[in-house]
């Protein structure tokens, strides 16, 4: 009888330990939210695009979180950002208009300490970050899918999310990203739509 009680107690303690260990570890490794917020920014300005004087009007919307990387002593940060934007580009000389819009979710998913204040960050961006429409609203070009990027950042050792980017590369795409093609000519597209 005593042996039965001891075995059951040992099994119960083992189960509790196994179930609580991952929860305790995940709490220790959960990133601390340094800052979060949202932004809604309408804009209107004159610009020069591909040699054309244009009027640009639109809006940017974002929700973001800046997270302290666990184990970095508050020196490295990762970003999560949901965004959408739209802008109408009008050529006053011709009265022709085109629009550019995008919507996506950007998140830095992995941080590796390189040395000193230098960190490597791996990011994933999903969605439709770049969509071009003609004056009638027809899609003439659309990027969509997943982009993986790698960057190396100098965090400057100041305990703030600002950093200096030392390297940045697009490592992989999944989906359709015609604007990234070697032969893509944005200026030719602009000229065709509003020139």
PLM feature segments, named:
Residues 1-25:
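Secretory targeting and sorting signals
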Residues 26-195:
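Beta-strand-enriched cores of mature, soluble protein domains
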């Amino acid at each position: 009888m005593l042996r039965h009680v001891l075995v059951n107690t040992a099994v119960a303690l083992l189960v509790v330990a196994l179930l609580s260990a991952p929860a305790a570890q995940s709490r220790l490794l959960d990133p601390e939210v340094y800052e979060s917020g949202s932004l809604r920014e309408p804009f209107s300005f004159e610009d020069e695009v591909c040699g054309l004087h244009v009027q640009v009007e639109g809006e940017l919307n974002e929700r973001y979180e800046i997270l302290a990387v666990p184990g970095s002593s508050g020196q490295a940060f990762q970003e999560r950002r949901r965004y959408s934007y739209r802008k109408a580009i009008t050529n006053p000389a011709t009265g022709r208009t085109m629009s550019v819009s995008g919507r996506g979710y950007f998140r830095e998913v992995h941080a590796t300490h390189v040395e000193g204040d230098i960190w490597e960050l791996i990011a994933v961006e999903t969605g439709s970050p770049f969509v071009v429409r003609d004056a009638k609203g027809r899609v003439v070009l659309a990027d969509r899918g997943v982009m993986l990027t790698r960057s190396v950042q100098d965090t400057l050792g100041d305990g703030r999310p600002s950093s200096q980017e030392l390297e940045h590369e697009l490592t992989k795409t999944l989906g359709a990203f015609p604007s990234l093609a070697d032969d893509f000519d944005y200026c030719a597209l602009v000229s065709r739509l509003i020139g």
